[in-house]
Amino acid sequence: MKVIFMGTPEFAVPALKKLITHHEVKAVFAQQPKAKGRGLNLAKSPIHQLAFEHQIPVYTPSTLRNDKTINLINKINADIIVVIAYGFIVPKAILEAKKYGCLNIHPSDLPRHRGAAPLQRTIIEGDRKSSVCIMRMDAGLDTGDILMKEDFDLEERTTLEELHNKCANLGAELLIKTLANIDNIVPIKQSSDGVTYAHKLTKEEGKINWYESAYKIDCKIRGMNPWPGAYFSYNDKIIKILEAEYLNAEHHFTSGTVISDKLEIACGSGILRVKKLQQESKKALNIEEFLRGTNILKDTILK
């Protein structure tokens, strides 16, 4: 099958690799190179780099909402468009430009976690089950019909990185199965029940509320690493907690109280045992290294 691929980050790489192996990728659309590092040199996105290595034409328009880009896509001889974490809204003219329309890999149990941050919200909400869906895109926000879906269980303390990698690889496999059977698949409309929205994360959301349960705070730590990071303030410094574990232990302390010299913190319910931290503008440290340089005393109440 002749494919136009639209994507940008690492999450989309396994799918593009599979498409290159099994189909004919006619063109790739990715976001424009961005300045990175101290030298602010322009760096290609992971998808742009992969397409470049395979000598596939790459286009990096600043928007899809103009006649020039729409006309370009219309001229490319392709049967289908695959869109994965591209970063731009796809207008109706492009959704309907090819015979089989536009397909999308969405890493959640739709209609739960529609939107920009399904992986993060899955972890933050403490979900123990999730899915990867192959969806035929329509004009709504992740409201299209489901062509193929695979459910799976999450371990209790699954990290964002683990979920990201699982969904990226599973999605790539499902995409190839979908394309192989696309003429025989009966699309399934999404339920109108159980709709939730996985809104884009904000930096402010990362601030830890010690009155929440230790379990909920642990979910936030795992779901917000690396960005924006779950953090607290100490001596006017922002400190991110990168790794912790929760203890379902009763206590009589005020929430936010440091109850041991190993940075165990009383929460609304339970205790959070911190294992890895990062102070702003400094490198990440395990708890022993951190406490050698920053002495947070027992009985301190964190904000």
UniProtKB/Swiss-Prot annotation:
EC number, UniProt record: 2.1.2.9
Catalytic activity, per the record?
A: L-methionyl-tRNA(fMet) + (6R)-10-formyltetrahydrofolate = N-formyl-L-methionyl-tRNA(fMet) + (6S)-5,6,7,8-tetrahydrofolate + H(+)
Quick check: keyword Lipid metabolism in the entry? no
Q: Which InterPro entries does the record match to this protein? A: Fmt, Formyl_trans_C, Formyl_transf_N, Formyl_transf_N_sf, Formyl_transferase-like_C_sf, Met-tRNA-FMT_C, Met-tRNA-FMT_N
Query: Quick one: which residues bind (6S)-5,6,7,8-tetrahydrofolate?
Result: S108, D109, L110, P111
Membrane spanning segments where? none
Instruction: List keywords of the entry alphabetically.
Output: Protein biosynthesis, Transferase
The protein's matches in Gene3D superfamilies, at most eight in alphabetical order, are given as:
3.40.50.12230
Gene Ontology CC entries for this record: cytosol
Give the record's family classification. Answer: Belongs to the Fmt family.
Please describe what this protein does: Attaches a formyl group to the free amino group of methionyl-tRNA(fMet). The formyl group appears to play a dual role in the initiator identity of N-formylmethionyl-tRNA by promoting its recognition by IF2 and preventing the misappropriation of this tRNA by the elongation apparatus.
**Designated name of the protein:** Methionyl-tRNA formyltransferase
Q: Which organism is it from?
A: Rickettsia felis (strain ATCC VR-1525 / URRWXCal2)
Gene designation per UniProt: fmt
